[in-house]
Curated annotation (Swiss-Prot):
Name of the protein in its database record: GDSL esterase/lipase At1g58525
InterPro entries: GDSL, GDSL_lipolytic_enzyme, Lipase_GDSL_AS, SGNH_hydro_sf, SGNH_plant_lipase-like
Subcellular location field: Secreted
Enzyme class: hydrolase
The enzyme's E.C. designation: 3.1.1.-
Signal peptide: 1-19
GO biological processes: lipid catabolic process
Gene Ontology CC terms, in alphabetical order: extracellular region
Originating organism: Arabidopsis thaliana
Family per record: Belongs to the 'GDSL' lipolytic enzyme family.
Amino acid sequence: MKLQILLLALVLIAVEANAVKQGINATIPALIVFGDSIMDTGNNNNLPTLLKCNFPPYGKDYPGGDATGRFSDGRVPSDLIAEKLGLAKTLPAYMNSYLKPEDLLKGVTFASRGTGYDPLTAKIMSVISVWDQLIYFKEYISKIKRHFGEEKAKDILEHSFFLVVSSSNDLAHTYLAQAHRYDRTSYANFLADSAVHFVRELHKLGARKIGVFSAVPVGCVPLQRTVFGGFFTRGCNEPLNNMAKQFNARLSPALDSLDKELDGVILYINVYDTLFDMIQHPKKYGFDVADKGCCGKGLLTISYLCNSLNPFTCSNSSSYIFWDSYHPSERAYQVIVDNLLDKYLSKVY
């Protein structure tokens, strides 16, 4: 009898160790994501917008080499985080018409390339605003209740990890259309306040474990370097980076206050410093190129300009921080996720 108990204990220990190794966390039923292209896994595919990438060479390093609508050579952070949580290797786009009810259980992404906290951003780009993403989230919860019951919906709301990722399109594009109303500082503050309002609304809908990404050093993406960084030097667009820093300076303490005010956990996730350090010191992270993308010549190549007719696309995208002139490669995303996820998840679960 003692031997049987000992063997059972060893089996349980082995199972638990394997679960940890595989990234399985039974306390996290799903990953729910809102935001822009960083987390979009194909929601724009059927929209009347030019901001699409469901064609080669996008997806060349994705399983099967499929161009699924992810703005990368492979997977994006929503996929990588879902895998790290032990949920799935890829996170489905909510707008995917082939989704079955059971596909909703591990989570979805509502993210749409080109959107932002400023409602004008999505309107200009003809994409899904973050506010409309909340409407789709309500629909998602209704589907969960209908197919799997109230208790399952309650479990997803209370224990899932919710991620909100936006601001780059607002800062880099929409500000130019709003400059008659705001200076750079006041616009960054407006965006941060809008982000806090979004989190409040998400919390009202039942979400209790929410992480919000900081703005990134969008002034250092290859396209910004090419257009604003000087013809020969191609340095970062520092005024744009300063706007991102102002957004972060406003957002971080506001989310800390919200975390104290509301039940659950609300986290500010500092992505800016990690990505900026990668761009400034690429060799430190195993990259060769940080100032241009792999696709095409990597200077202004994005969306339809990054296509299979372009003969200049690199053969080894993992040596580049950026895949196209705006979006990181899968390997760069993996470095960011590995550097940040465990640190912040430990504050939630």
